[in-house]
A protein has these predicted regions:
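Structural signature of nuclease core domains in nucleic-acid processing machines
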Residues: 1-102
Length: 102
């Protein structure tokens, strides 16, 4: 599977799931990863004749480097898998904008 992986160096008081979600929302990384996902989706459509979002795209992995602790599995790791429907809708929306400009 293909994943979007991004490293973050944010200094947070806590690197548990709730703190990471708050950081994702505060910094608008959720918007960032949706844009990344649309870009990867478009690339895969062009490169793979049998591309299927559910089968080939594994999701988002944001690694908060300061929070990764081997003794605390999952600490410093944010994961998400945006729904295919959302990615297809965004892709169509961006395509319309490109056509409107042309």
């Amino acid at each position: 599977k293909i994943f979007v992986v991004d490293y973050k160096s944010n200094s947070l008081p806590d690197y548990g799931p709730a703190a990471l979600l708050q950081s994702i929302q505060d910094q608008e990384y959720d918007l960032q990863y949706l844009l990344y996902t649309v870009a990867v989706h478009r690339w895969l459509v062009l490169r793979m004749t049998d591309y299927c979002y559910d089968r080939h795209f594994g999701g988002i992995r944001y690694l908060y480097a300061r929070g990764i602790t081997p003794s605390l599995p999952g600490s410093g790791l944010f994961t998400d898998l945006p729904p295919e429907r959302l990615i297809l809708s965004l892709d169509r929306c961006f395509s319309r904008k490109e056509q409107d400009r042309g």
